[in-house]
Amino acid sequence: MKLVIVSGRSGSGKSVALRVLEDLGYYCVDNLPLQLIGPLLAQLKGNNDKVAISIDIRNMPEQEKALEKELARLPEGVELTSFFLNSSDKVLLKRYSETRRLHPLSRSKVSLQEAIKLEGKMLAPISNMVDHFIDTSNLNVYELADAVRQILLGRTDKELVIIFESFGFKHGMPTEADFMFDARFLPNPHWEPELRPLTGLDEPVKLFLERQVLVNKYIWQIENLLETWLPHLERNNRSYLTIAIGCTGGQHRSVYIAEQLAKRFANSHHKVEARHRELNAKA
C-alpha cells in the first residue's frame, strides 16, 4: 500500500495537492486525526492500495512526537511519501487577505499576521521530517500540481481521460459533455429495414456507415478539431474530457462515430473510453 502524507502551513496549497492525488487514484482524507491513520489503513486494506491524508495545525498537539509515534506504528509493507508545503509569511498574508478566510489559529484571538508566524513555528519540526519540501510562494495552482506529479510519477503531465459518449437527442442531452456533436443530418440506417433492429456496434451497420462520404468527413473533422485543441485542454489541468455524439435515438450513427473516434485516439498517450448511454440503458 502507498501512503502519502501532505502537511504544511494553512494557505500553502494542501487542498491543491490533495486534488492532484485524488486525480492520480488516491483515496484522500483531509485533516485526519493522527490516531486514526492506522485504523483507516486497516479498513482500506485490500480495497484501496493508494491512500493520501493531509494533516495540519488543527490535528494534534505536540505534533512532532505524535507524528513520529504514529509513523512508527504503520503496518509493514506501507510505502510512505511525505510532503510539506510552505510559503513565505508575506505571501500567506496576501492570500488570506484576498480570500477573506479565517486562519485556524485566528480563533486564539491573535491577529492574522501573528497566527501565520505562530503556525510556522509550531509546524517547523514536521517540516524537517518530510521527504519533500515544496515552497509554493511563487507557484500558481498548475505549477504546484506539476511539482506534486513530478515527485510521484517522475513526470509533470497528467493522464487525460477522453470519453466518447453516444446518446439520442430524443432522450435528452447529456449535461456533463465538454463538446457535443450532432449527427442527425447524416444518412440514417434506421430507414433500412434490415438494419433497424441493429446498433452501431453491429457489422452490417458499420459497413453501411463507412461507405458514406459525409460520415467519414464528419469523423475526420471532429478528430482534427480535437487533436488541435487537446494540448491546450491538457495544460488547463483537467482530468476528464467528454465528447458527446448525438443522433435521433442513440442507436446507430452516434454509436458508430463514438466507436470510430475512440479507436483513432486509442493510439495516443491518453486513456480513452467509449460509452453508449442509450445502449447501456437497454442492457
From Swiss-Prot:
The entry's keywords: ATP-binding, GTP-binding, Nucleotide-binding
Coiled-coil portions: none
GO molecular function term, any single one: ATP binding
Function description: Displays ATPase and GTPase activities.
Statement: the UniProt record of this protein carries the keyword Nucleotide-binding: yes
UniProt binding sites for ATP: 8-15
Name this protein carries in UniProt: Nucleotide-binding protein Sama_3091
InterPro entries in the cross-refs: P-loop_NTPase, RapZ-like, RapZ-like_N, RapZ_C
One family name in Pfam for this protein: PapZ_C
Annotated binding of GTP, by residue: 56-59
Family: Belongs to the RapZ-like family.
